[in-house]
Each structure stands twice: as C-alpha cells, then as structure tokens.
C-alpha cells in the first residue's frame, strides 16, 4: 500500500568511504531492479539485479562496466564494457539467471574515437546502440522481440555527420485504421544547424538514408562553415540573417539564427525544440493535427509555447512610459560603457535610433532589443501516453518554475517554483536583452539585469560571458 522505497542510497552507502549510483533500470512489470554502484571513485560500476518483492539479489554481478539496461520482459540484460582508457567500446548480452561467463559480445567498436552506449527506444520496441565521436554518430537497432538477433545500422555511418533517431507512431492514421510506425531522425547531413525528418517505416526495412522522409524543420545555414553547401553565399552572411524555408512551420519562417534542437512525438502531442535569436523555444501541437499535416505533405502547424505568467507580467505590470524609461536607462548605461572602452569596443556604435525616434505610443520592442528574455525547455516527460507535457522556464529575475500544459486546450498549471530566501521580489528587478555589433559586423546578444531603484548610468557593472562549442549563456536565475 502507498509508496515503496526501492533504493535507499544512505543505507546502501554504509561501510563505504565512497558511494555513487551509476544507473538504475526497473523492469516493466515492476518486479526487478537493475542498478550500478561505484564504491572506489574510478567510475567503473558494478551492476546487480535485485528483486523488489523480496529484496534478494541474483548471483550474477556485472563488474567494472559503463552501463546496462533490461529488455522489457527483464529476461535479458545488455551492458557496455570499458577498455583500459575508460572508453565504452563493446556491448554484451546476458540471459538473466545464467553465469556472466556465458555472456556474448554483440557489438565491438574498433575505432578508438568512438564511445558506445546501449538502451531502449522510447517506445521500448527496439534495443538501441549509439556510437559516436566528437563529429560523427551512428545508431544500430535490434527488435526487443528478437534479443538474440543481430544489430543492424539504422543509417550507415558517414564521416562528420551526426544523427540521432527516435521512434513513435501515428495511432490509427493508416488507410485501414492501422498505426503508422515512425522513425524521427535528427541530423546535420544536409544542414549545419540540423534538421528533422520523419520516416514512414512501412516504406521499407532499414537501413535508411539521411534526408529520407518528410522534412519537418530545417535550421538556418547562414554564417555556418558549410552553409554554402545549402545555399550559395550563406557562409558569408551574418548568423542572424532572417531565414525562411518552405518546409518549415509558419512560426519558424523568418527566424533569426535558427537552430533545430529536437522533437518528441508522444501519444497526444508533439513538441519541437529550437533556438532563435540565441534563445531557446518550444512549439507544440496535437498529435492528430501532426498526423493530418504529415499525410497531406504540408508544413506542420506548431504554436509557440509562451508561459502565461510571463505574458501577464509583460501586458499588465508595465506602462509604456515605464518601458521607455527603462530603455533610456539601458542605452545610457551602454553609452557609458562604450565611452569608457573606446572606438574599438564591441558595444561602440550601438544604434539608438529606435529609442530616439519612438513617439512613446506603443510598448513594442524596438529593433535591436529583445523583450522576451528567458530559458524554456522540455523535460520530465518519460511517459509516452501522458496527455500533458511538462516544461521548465527561468530568467535572470525569475526563479526556476516547473509547469505542465495540455497542448490541446492550452491549460497551463504551475507545479513547482524555486524558493528564494531573504524577501526576494522579482518585480524589483529588470532584465532586457540588446544586440551590439562587433568589429567583424556580427551581432552579439547582451543581457542586462538591474534593480529598478538603482541608477543604471552611475552604478558599477559586472560583465561576464562565454561562447564556444555551441554552448550558450542562456538566461537563468
């Protein structure tokens, strides 16, 4: 009755100077737990199988491995071996209840640049081996109905091409009411900022090819090293050049600096994650609408997810005069910084035209300024069948929040908000993003945060930033 504690780390750690969990998998029937522990700190894990009914463990122990997973029926364990350099390089198959000395190697990665992983697909219909280097990836599949079969490449490896694949289906959308099995491929073979293709797997058995299927979303090639392969002259254009593509949903048309970051297709909804104007975005639509667009061969009709709480703040809390006053403070601070750093600074030459030409009649964001300034991301949605989607968001002045939303109705519920001690009040702080032009002509986003009652032009400024390896300094509390 009620909740059951399946693993108490504090109790398990008794008698060990070091103790760390290295992964956990619960069988689909809830009877068995596969878990790994490291008691020496060397990041090699010993995995064991424990009965959740009796608490007893099976005799087999998988020593010094990198990770492991059950098949859905918990009759088999697949796990990853490590070499002397701690590289995951091989996948082993184990029948539960037999000696580990009888285990069989089912995959061996010979190229030392590549690391190997094993897991189940989201729909639990396939075992998935993922192998990848810094610039190249490959996915191999094996049906969970045939665990003793041979893994096959879903798409053969191509040097300097990264791809990932997930699986879903359009329930009852076939001509005879059958399900349409889908492979959702995320790759950069044809576009440096990635694209998403959805393949109807009824067409043929794997292997497939990169670019096959229906293109759902395509990133911008502008300012990218290989952009000219997509569009002549694209690599020499500024990253923020507006990008349009007939395959893209309407909400992506004309986006600045568009990068595609992923998609998830659940039973009731589809969620697209992308980046534009250097900020993260989520777009959602119902599964039924996605199936209709897919079968009709037209762009999918996504709607951007905007947290209702933020919409309320923008629309109600600030008058036009207040917003224009804030703008004057922001640009005054930038003028001060530019004067201090001289003509060669990145902030020198920022245009004030939008502010000085404004007649104060509207509260719209001026060119070069971003009113939307927060991070948003999909997370915590492990169930394929759940009708609601969880997402999180945060900004420089708003503690992190966890919400769930019904994509069909738009009903948004706050589940949790981070607590800040000391009487913190978000409305006492302001945040804005402006764009400054660097010496090479590229536009750079600058986020500004300050207390409303602190004079922006006469106060000290703390400056920090980072930008490399496609790692962004996203807004966060």
Q: What is the meaning of each model-derived region?
A:
Residues 1, 26-41, 78-85, 95, ...:
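Beta-strand C-termini and the immediately following turn/loop, strongest in propeller blades
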Residues 52-55, 95-99, 143-147, 201-204, ...:
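Short loop/turn segments that connect beta-strands within beta-propeller blades
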Residues 2-56:
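Well-ordered mid-protein domain cores that form the structural environment of catalytic cofactors
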Residues 13-36, 62-80, 111-130, 153, ...:
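Conserved beta-propeller blade repeats
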Residues 2-10, 58-62, 102-107, 150-155, ...:
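Beta-propeller fold detector
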Residues 12-18, 37-46, 61-63, 70, ...:
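A flexible loop/linker signature enriched in serine peptidases of the S9 family
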Residues 175-178, 226-242, 318-352, 356-477:
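Serine-hydrolase catalytic core recognition
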């Amino acid at each position: 009755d009620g909740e059951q504690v399946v693993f108490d780390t504090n109790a398990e750690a008794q008698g060990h100077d070091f103790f760390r969990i290295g992964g956990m998998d619960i069988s689909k029937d809830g009877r068995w737990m596969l878990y790994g522990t490291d008691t020496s700190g060397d990041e090699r894990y010993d995995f064991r199988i424990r009965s959740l009914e009796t608490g007893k463990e099976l005799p087999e122990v998988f020593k010094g491995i990198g990770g492991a997973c059950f098949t859905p029926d918990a009759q088999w364990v697949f796990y990853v071996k490590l070499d002397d350099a701690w590289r995951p390089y091989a996948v082993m198959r184990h029948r539960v209840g037999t000696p580990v000395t009888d285990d069989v190697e089912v995959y061996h990665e010979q190229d030392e640049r590549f690391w190997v992983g094993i897991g189940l697909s989201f729909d639990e219909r396939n075992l998935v081996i993922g192998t990848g280097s810094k610039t190249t990836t490959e996915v191999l599949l094996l049906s969970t109905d045939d665990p003793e079969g041979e893994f096959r490449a879903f798409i053969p490896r191509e040097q300097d091409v990264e791809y990932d694949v997930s699986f879903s289906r359009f329930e009852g959308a076939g001509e005879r009411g059958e399900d349409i099995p889908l492979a959702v491929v995320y790759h950069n073979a044809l576009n440096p900022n990635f694209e998403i293709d959805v393949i109807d797997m009824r067409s043929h058995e794997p292997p497939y090819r990169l670019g096959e299927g229906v293109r759902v979303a395509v990133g911008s090639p502008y300012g990218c090293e290989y952009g000219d392969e997509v569009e002549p002259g694209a690599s020499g254009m500024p990253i923020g050049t507006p990008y349009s593509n007939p395959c893209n949903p309407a909400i992506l048309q004309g986006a600045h600096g568009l990068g595609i970051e992923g998609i998830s297709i659940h039973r009731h909804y589809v969620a697209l994650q992308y980046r534009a104007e250097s900020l993260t975005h989520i777009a959602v639509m119902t599964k039924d609408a996605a199936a209709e667009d897919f079968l009709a061969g037209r762009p999918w009709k996504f709607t951007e997810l905007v947290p209702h709480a933020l919409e309320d703040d923008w629309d109600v809390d600030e008058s036009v005069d207040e917003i224009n006053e804030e703008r004057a403070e922001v640009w005054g601070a930038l003028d001060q910084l530019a004067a201090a750093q001289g003509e060669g600074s990145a902030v020198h030459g920022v245009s004030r035209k939008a502010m000085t030409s404004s007649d104060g009649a509207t509260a719209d964001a001026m060119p070069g300024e971003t009113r939307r300034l927060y991070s948003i991301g999909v997370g915590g949605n492990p169930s394929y069948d759940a009708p609601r989607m969880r997402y999180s968001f945060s900004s420089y002045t708003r503690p992190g929040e966890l919400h769930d939303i019904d994509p069909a109705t738009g009903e948004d519920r706050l589940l949790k908000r981070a607590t800040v001690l000391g009487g913190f009040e978000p409305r006492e702080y302001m945040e804005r993003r402006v764009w400054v032009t660097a010496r090479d002509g590229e536009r750079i986003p600058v986020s500004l945060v300050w207390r409303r009652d602190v004079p922006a032009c006469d106060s000290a400024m703390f400056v920090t930033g980072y930008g490399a390896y496609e790692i962004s300094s996203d807004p966060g509390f």
